[in-house]
Amino acid sequence: NIAIIEACEVTPDGKIYLTAAGGIAPTVCRLADQIIVELNAAHSKNAMGLHDVYEPLDPPYRREIPIYKPSDRIGQPYIQVDPKKIVGVVETNWPDEARSFAEADPLTDKIGQNVADFLAADMKRGIIPSTFLPLQSGVGNIANAVLGALGRDKTIPAFEMYTEVIQNSVIGLIRDGRVKFGSACSLTVTNDCLQGIYDDMDFFRDKLVLRPSEISNSPEVVRRLGVISINTAIEADLYGNVNSTHIGGTKMMNGIGGSGDFTRNAYISIFTCPSVAKEGKISAIV
């Protein structure tokens, strides 16, 4: 029962400061008998303070998760463990294996504009408040196009994000002042972008927070905040059934966080995709 935890810093009294993701690290550290800390120099110590580590109590003593806006911090910036559980610290310098996505094209730009127009219309109708609502977005070139369109639409005010992952496009919108705050479980950004965040942490410190996945993806919090979820579909039918994870029933293309945790609990749930795939040979509407 050994946990291996990546960190940017560890202290003699058992404080572990995580790097670019929260995941299930707090739970793993609590349950493990022994902990090996991977002290990764590829992640700057400037990451200290980026995380908000919180674990709910077990029933019957569990209370609500007291997050009432995306920027709320309810825990600690580190994982506290018994120092006796830490049996080793291994020093590494290994960057994340981040990948970039294809640039936007006329098709993805049009999808993005359609979403922006839809949300702007809902805001005019009073379905969405004039201050807007927090967004959750998946990752990929379509998601980038949607976020780009929302950022360019000046009828939509600067907004917050309560999401599972934050990608490069969100960081750009934060720098431009179009995203006021981003709450997520992980930073899924390119290494250059991540280094830029670390180098400019004085700017980002009050604009980003990383949480454990059971908090970032909590149905309770998603419902309370009135999150608008935007995820990519592989195929959908006219009855509203959406496949956003598998191709051919066996090849997994996407995780289930967006579809499983956010879509089912969001105030407004949106799926985006082109109408056809494989150069028009396969319909995405089945």
Regions found by a protein language model. Name each.
Residues 1-286:
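Conserved alpha/beta enzyme-core scaffold
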